[in-house]
Amino acid sequence: MSPRRIAVVGASAAGLAAAEALRRFGWTGTLTLVGDEPHPPYDRPPLSKQLLQGAWEPGKLHLRAADQLDALGLDLRLGTRAAALDTATRTLTLAGGERLACDGVIVATGVAARTLPEAAGLDGVHTLRTLEDALALKARLSGTGRRLVVVGNGVLGCEAAAVARELGHEVTLVGREPLPMARTVGAEIGELLAAEHRARGVRLRTAAVGGFEADGDGPVRHVTAVRLADGTRLPADTVLVAIGSEPAVGWLRGDPALDTTDGLRCDAYCAAAPGVYAAGDVARWQHPVHGRELRVEHRMNATEQGMAAARNLLAELAETLPDGGNGALAPAAGRERRPFTPVPYFWSDQYALKIQAYGVLTGADRTAATVVDREARKAVALYGHGGQATGVLAIGLPPRQVRGLRALIATPAPWDEACEGVRAAVA
């Protein structure tokens, strides 16, 4: 009989959390962790903050020390890309052609940065998703060129613009939305963020990008400007394209049993097919509390969902493996599956601003923002959908006060009750 195996595809925060939880919950069989990057699991949020600032060296990003990874007894496949998954036979095919027979698979491949086709092959145009991306951008910003154009005014673009401005660069932040992060946080909070960026010297432009200008006609052409759709020319030594991401599901599209529209579609238990679960940025699952499908690209969710997927997979295997796992499944693993019902949390640091949010902000049909202290950049915003509060965001408030707002979202509370709760919390 072949050895029992679970494969976790994706070696970032969600994949690591899943691997650790599988061992903690009783899996003693082979545990394969596949990652397409050559690095051991590392933390991504500091790429646009501490690493870009120069405050951290790359080694500080590692999520676990080497001896901690060794203790997990992993079949570690770094620098290895998954090529296909056959859910009917639970066979994972790697890019080199190796085929792994699995009892279970957890997909945690995350997302890839979106790019602009007009920027292909241009030196000085960057994205920011991987460690290599961050190091390349950091090196570029350490050079003589001081003019940075950031294309995309979402969370990542705003964070990178803030860091570059603090490093002394001339920064122009370009976005289709009229205000920074407006698609996520709404107009009133967006106005507050816009005021902070302007006060720090960032130039804000609302426009689509029409193309790029570059010098030379050889194999290496250096970007010199960004052209906006209205014809405006923005001189640039460096360009960061931060226009969102695409779920890394291309390798799964050959299996008709999987729905890969906007991530890997899962049920409330994070299951995409029998024995196949998903976690992190790539997972689109049915949230029982919010009553709709969510795909959450937040660091905390990656860890929580990785653990949930591991627990639910082992609960399924405890019931379905014909031989009880042949010793690969400890008795403690035979627990019931549980729906994944997190209260999503994210944070963003921009200059001295600490932005924290609980719940779901996008898709809101109503918003109530309270500016507690405009001069001190302190504010709270409540987001609702269908008569209930679904999300809350705070800027500049003490952590304990922000955590107190979480209870309004966890249930979630009726809209009027939540509004009263916010007013009481900031009074």
Task: Give the location of each predicted region.
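Residue-level detector of alpha-helix initiation sites
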Residues: 12-16, 38, 111-113, 132, ...
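C-terminal catalytic lobe of FAD-dependent flavoproteins
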Residues: 5, 230-258, 351-427
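Rossmann-like NAD(P)H-binding beta-loop-alpha module
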Residues: 136-185, 189
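A Rossmann-like FAD-binding core segment of flavoenzymes
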Residues: 28-30, 70, 76-94, 100, ...
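FAD-binding core/adjacent interface of flavoenzyme oxidoreductases
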Residues: 1-7, 63-149, 227-229, 238-242, ...
